[in-house]
UniProtKB/Swiss-Prot annotation:
Residues annotated with Phosphoserine modification: 421
The gene coding this protein: Ube3b
Entry-linked Gene3D superfamilies: Hect, E3 ligase catalytic domain, Hect, E3 ligase catalytic domains
Phenotype caused by lack of the gene: UBE3B knockout results in growth retardation, decreased grip strength, and loss of vocalization. Knockout mice show corpus callosum hypoplasia, enlarged ventricles, and decreased thickness of the somatosensory cortex. Brain-specific conditional knockout (cKO) leads to impaired dendrite arborization and increased density of dendritic spines in CA1 excitatory and cortical pyramidal neurons, and alters the electrophysiological properties of neurons and neuronal networks in the hippocampus.
Residues annotated with N-acetylmethionine modification: 1
Chief location: other
GO-annotated biological processes: protein polyubiquitination; regulation of postsynapse assembly
Record key words, sorted: Acetylation, Phosphoprotein, Synapse, Transferase, Ubl conjugation pathway
Reactions listed under catalytic activity: S-ubiquitinyl-[E2 ubiquitin-conjugating enzyme]-L-cysteine + [acceptor protein]-L-lysine = [E2 ubiquitin-conjugating enzyme]-L-cysteine + N(6)-ubiquitinyl-[acceptor protein]-L-lysine
EC number(s) stated in the UniProt entry for this protein: 2.3.2.26
Function description: E3 ubiquitin-protein ligase which accepts ubiquitin from an E2 ubiquitin-conjugating enzyme in the form of a thioester and then directly transfers the ubiquitin to targeted substrates. Ubiquitinates BCKDK and targets it for degradation, thereby regulating various metabolic processes. Involved in the positive regulation of neurite branching in hippocampal neurons and the control of neuronal spine number and morphology, through the ubiquitination of PPP3CC.
Designated name of the protein: Ubiquitin-protein ligase E3B
Domain HECT: 704-1070
Length: 1070
């Protein structure tokens, strides 16, 4: 019974709980239903009300359009209130348009005060309501201006309408109510206008105008009419003028308006009178004063970011170009503002692509977001930026430099009269063309004389200007060449800047700048920026000048000045390296080194091609080669950097010794040197004399790099298939190598051609006719590398431009194909450079950007650029044509052949080993010294066989004939007769392998069996079997061996030897 009672009670409680919850849910449903019904009724009521109001408004404007009498201002006011009550910008834009037109029509009414919409502002009851209403209407206009697209015709009409509304009600000048007696109301109404303008500014008027102007102007063809542009710019200027140019309004004007892409350029062409307004308000001066403050300038740049900061710079520069006199007065502030803006952009300029960078057409890789909408304006922006390096601005900024005189203690240099040119000078058509014109000024030889205080106002001013241009070079990376070309436009700027540099400090430029390297002060950085600018500009100028302009016309720099400059640079770079400054250099220090070193190497390479500096000019006498080698052995970084960057400061002979030591060390490391405990691996090859090139190619091309560097033994097989007698102890391989090189470099094979004139070798453009021609070139490279590796000199004279490519010079950004062109074809070079100096119109010559070549009887047209055969050569592109043509002839035509040969050569010779040599020095490394043969050195290192000795009469006669009777050319022929190379080894005959040898022979070569006891004794005691007067001297070039009969008379020896070397009867193997 107790259990049943408990169960019933629980069931009853649960039932009551469920009923209570259901009642609560029902009440919530009813409450929600009421709320929803109220919302729906409210929505439907509002929709009916809005529909009724819109209907009323539509009827109002329909009646207005039907041509009935003009509506009163009060009617417009009331209908405007109703419209503003329900206005949605997207839905009611057409009604808002009609309202604006009605308001503007009312303002145009003549002598009808009740019609003028503005008259309501004078009603005490309506003044505040009217002001509130016009503010609302005008802001709706602003919102629509931010959405409309000016390139669409209908939108452009609406833009004109809304701009007219804004212009009309932010200034009282067009209000007819103020005519006559109403003039007394102007102050009050001006106050109202100022209030309206202040409200719009707070809501974001400047942002709206920026969007409108950018949309209308940042495109290939601007789509804002003169009226639109004038209205928008007037609106932007009004608040600033009204606030008397306060900083609070100058800031948004600069940030939102002056940063519109190429705004000033468009104003100058579309609405030039607006620029007159800017000038009347002295706005440029006010911009400069505002931006020269570091904090305000940084704030503006951070608000704009890099892309729009460039736009602001462009507009300021354009304004400056129109007000040069003002710039003279405000130069310091102008330079400071531009430098700060460039420095801000520079922080985000990246050296290479990454996930965090974006491409900018002027700044390059940029780590801030890039507004690609500006790309269409970039041409005009760049044109505006060009005012920075245009001649008028350069003349103003560098006026102190250009007008200055050298200090009294600078000694004048004698001036050599230059022959006058019969050609008349044409008008300058471009900056680049002007860089080639001859300077008429007479200057002094410049020496580091010192005497100008570095803390003087003049020096600080020049330093600030140099910092500006140097910052522009490192920031505007994609138009760097344009900047350099502009800065080198004036012939006398760089020489006078160099004179200024020489006069800095108490002892002259070098000591001062070396001290600056160790001082991390602002003054030191500015001085070093001046040096960097000078180096960058001078390097650019010398790179684009040809030899005639450098050596004969001596444009900008006299040769004596180049000697002085190169001496300064050589010392400066060496000190930077040797004092450890370069080892850990980064940032500005690294840029300084690259700048100074780049200018130094351009001068050095120019001197290597055609000397202007005295002998041993490039050597550093305070650098002892022994000390350098010791530091290299200890792996000291500074010694390695000297060889990497300025190897020319070390005497050539020492560098050759270093090269040979590098080879020896590698051989030891690879186990290629005979030791007491091990012998190197030997590769044996068998070569048929009749197919020497083919067999050598087949057997050696597959060898590994290690095997090619190792010992290779050659066994020759004669035409009958019989092995030739003799053991190869490097001599036979030397003959094989020389014979291979002789055959592959024979122009008749068409792997190589010779240049016109001096007949130097380079890859043949038509060598592709050979099967597997690229593999052949790689094999040739390996053979040439093997010869250099083993110290075997081969008589292979290469064209200078080809040697430059072997050294990798053509990869340098300062490499000029035109400079190397004379080494390929001097006549072709003269013809090309004559185009640069052509008096008439280049287009009359009928040239195109193409090159026609006769290839095996067929005329082939090579386009220098895509579509080049249809692009005529004009005065504007003739410089490009010259460089393209030179690059095609020396690089494009033989690119694959050159790459294959260099690949083979570098598989034997490491690139870093030969980078310490110049182009002529590399030729000497390959072919031996071009100095006259040192007979005493040769005599000292000669080995005698067959009874000959140093006091033997035949040997005495031989040396006397070589010294007294033979000409230098005949001595070279004699050396080639014995060694197969007409030049002595670079380090002297002590390094000739095998050593130079002379052996007494009594029989012909086919009967010669070598030295026997009898033959040696007969030779020693001058005993002859028979008179050898009818026999000629012979040689075994593979052993550097001269076989000399035991002649009885000196005259016979002289006659036979001269005949033998002229017939070149060498290449015989005993």
């Amino acid at each position: 019974m107790f259990t049943v009672s408990q169960t019933s009670r629980a069931w009853f409680i649960d039932r009551a709980r469920q009923a209570r919850e259901e009642r609560l849910v029902q009440k919530e449903r009813e409450r929600s239903a009421v709320t929803i019904q109220a919302l729906v009724r409210s929505f439907l009521c509002r929709r009916r009300l809005h529909r009724d109001i819109r209907k009323e408004i539509d009827e109002f404007f329909s009646a207005d359009e039907s041509g009935s009498s003009k509506r009163s201002a009060l009617c417009i006011f009331k209908i405007a209130r109703r419209l503003l009550f329900i206005c949605k910008t997207t839905e009611d834009s057409e009604r808002l348009e009609k309202l604006c037109r009605s308001i503007l029509n009312s303002m145009d009414a003549e002598n009808e005060p009740k019609v003028w919409y503005v008259s309501l502002a004078l009603s005490k009851d309506l003044t505040l309501l009217w002001i509130k209403q016009i503010k609302s209407i005008l802001w709706h206009c602003c919102e629509l201006l931010g959405q409309l697209k000016p390139e669409i015709l209908q939108d452009s009409r609406l833009i004109t309408l809304y701009l007219t509304m804004l212009v009309t009600f932010t200034d009282t000048s067009t209000w007819k109510i103020l005519r006559g007696k109403g003039e007394s109301l102007r102050p009050a109404l001006n106050h109202i206008c100022a209030n309206i303008m202040g409200h719009l500014n707070q809501r974001g008027l400047y942002s709206v105008l920026q969007v409108l102007l950018t949309r209308g102007l940042a495109r290939p063809r601007p789509c804002l009419s003169k009226g639109m542009l004038t209205a928008a710019f007037s609106l932007a200027l009004r608040p600033v003028v009204a606030a008397q140019f306060s900083d609070n309004l100058m800031r948004p004007f600069i940030i939102h308006v002056m940063s519109v892409p190429a705004l000033v350029a468009h104003l100058s062409t579309v609405a030039p009178e607006r620029l007159g307004v800017l000038e009347s308000h002295d706005m440029l001066r006010k911009f400069i004063v505002f931006l020269r403050d570091r904090d305000r300038c940084r704030d503006a740049c951070e608000s704009l970011e890099g892309c729009h900061t460039l736009c602001l710079m462009g507009n300021l520069l354009h304004l400056g170009s129109l007000s040069l006199r003002l710039l003279e007065e405000e130069m310091d502030g102008f330079v400071s503002a531009l430098t700060q803006m460039l420095c801000y952009c520079q922080k985000y300029v990246a050296q290479k692509k990454s996930n965090l960078t974006h491409w900018h057409p002027v700044l390059g890789w940029f780590s801030q977001p890039v507004d690609y909408g500006l790309n269409d304006s970039m041409y005009l922006i760049t044109k505006q930026l060009q005012f920075l390096w245009a001649v008028p601005l350069i003349r103003i900024l560098f006026s102190d430099i250009l007008s200055r005189k050298l200090l009294e203690h600078a000694e004048p240099a004698p001036v050599q009269p230059q022959p006058s040119s019969p050609q008349t000078v044409l008008p300058v058509k471009s900056l680049l063309k002007r860089a080639f014109q001859k300077s008429a000024s007479v200057r002094n030889i410049l020496r580091p004389v010192g005497g100008r205080r570095v803390d003087s106002a003049e020096v600080r001013k020049v330093c600030n200007i140099c910092v500006l241009y140097q910052t522009s070079l490192t920031t505007l990376t994609q138009i760097r060449l344009q900047i350099l070309t502009g800065l080198t436009y004036l012939d006398d700027l760089l020489p006078k800047l160099w004179a200024f540099i020489c006069e800095l400090g108490p002892h002259g430029g070098l000591k001062l700048f070396l001290e600056c390297l160790n001082n991390d002060t602002g003054e030191s950085k500015q001085l070093l920026a001046m040096l960097m600018l000078f180096c960058d500009c001078s390097r650019h100028l010398i790179t684009i000048l040809d030899d005639i302009e450098v050596y004969e016309e001596q444009i900008s720099f006299k040769l004596e000045e180049l000697v002085t400059i190169s001496s300064f640079l050589n010392s400066f770079v060496f000190k930077m390296i040797w004092d450890g400054i370069v080892e850990n250099a980064k940032g500005e220090t690294l840029e300084l080194f690259q700048s100074v070193h780049g200018w130094l190497m351009v001068l050095y390479e120019r001197d290597c091609r055609r000397r202007f500096a005295p002998e041993d000019h490039w050597l550093r006498r305070d650098l002892k080669p022994g000390v350098l080698f010791q530091e290299l052995d200890k792996d000291r970084r500074r010694a390695q950097l000297v060889l990497q960057h300025i190897p020319h400061v070390v005497p050539h002979k020492n560098r050759v010794l270093l090269f040979r030591n590098m080879v020896i060390k590698e051989k030891e490391k690879l186990g290629l040197v005979e030791t007491s405990s091990a012998s190197p691996h030997v590769t044996h090859i068998t070569i048929r004399r009749s197919r020497m090139l083919e067999d050598g190619y087949e057997q050696l091309r597959q060898l590994s790099q290690h095997a090619m560097k190792g010992v290779i033994r050659v066994k020759f097989v004669n035409d009958l298939g019989v092995d030739e007698a003799g053991i190869d102890q490097d001599g036979v391989f030397k003959e094989f190598l020389e014979e291979i090189i002789k055959r592959v470099f024979d122009p008749a094979l068409n792997l190589f051609k010779t240049t016109s004139g001096d007949e130097r070798l380079y890859p043949s453009p038509t060598s592709y006719i050979h099967e597997n021609y690229l593999q052949l070139f790689e094999f040739v490279g390996k053979m040439l590398g093997k010869a250099v590796y083993e110290g075997i000199v081969v008589d292979v004279p290469f064209a200078s431009f080809f040697l430059s490519q072997m050294l990798g010079h053509h990869h340098s950004v300062f490499y000029s194909s035109v400079d190397e062109l004379p080494s390929l074809d001097s006549e072709f070079y003269k013809n090309l450079t004559s185009i640069k100096r052509y008096d008439g119109d280049i287009a009359d010559l009928g040239l195109t950007l193409s090159y026609d070549e006769d290839v095996m009887g067929q005329l082939v047209c090579h386009e220098l650029v895509p579509g080049g055969k249809t692009i005529p050569v004009t005065d504007e592109n003739k410089i490009s044509y010259i460089h393209l043509m030179a690059h095609f002839r020396m690089h494009t035509q033989i690119k694959n052949q050159t790459a294959a040969l260099i690949s083979g050569f570098r598989s034997i010779i490491k690139p870093e080993w030969i980078r310490m040599f110049s182009t002529p020095e590399l030729q000497r490394l390959i072919s031996g010294d071009n100095a006259e043969i040192d007979l005493e050195d040769l005599k000292k290192h000669t080995v005698y066989y067959g009874g000959f000795h140093g006091s033997h009469r035949v040997i005495i006669w031989l040396w006397d004939i070589l010294a007294s009777d033979f000409t230098p050319e005949e001595r070279a022929m004699f050396l080639k007769f014995v060694t197969s190379c007409s030049r002595p080894p670079l380090l002297g005959f002590a390094y000739l392998k095998p050593p130079f040898s002379i052996r007494c022979v009594e029989v012909s070569d086919d009967q010669d069996t070598g030295d026997t006891l009898g033959s040696v004794l007969r030779g020693f005691f001058t005993i002859r079997k028979r008179e050898p007067g009818g026999r000629l001297p012979t040689s075994s070039t593979c052993f550097n061996l001269l076989k000399l009969p035991n002649y009885s008379k000196k005259s016979v020896l002289r006659e036979k030897l001269r005949y033998a070397i002229s017939m070149n009867t060498g290449f015989e193997l005993s």
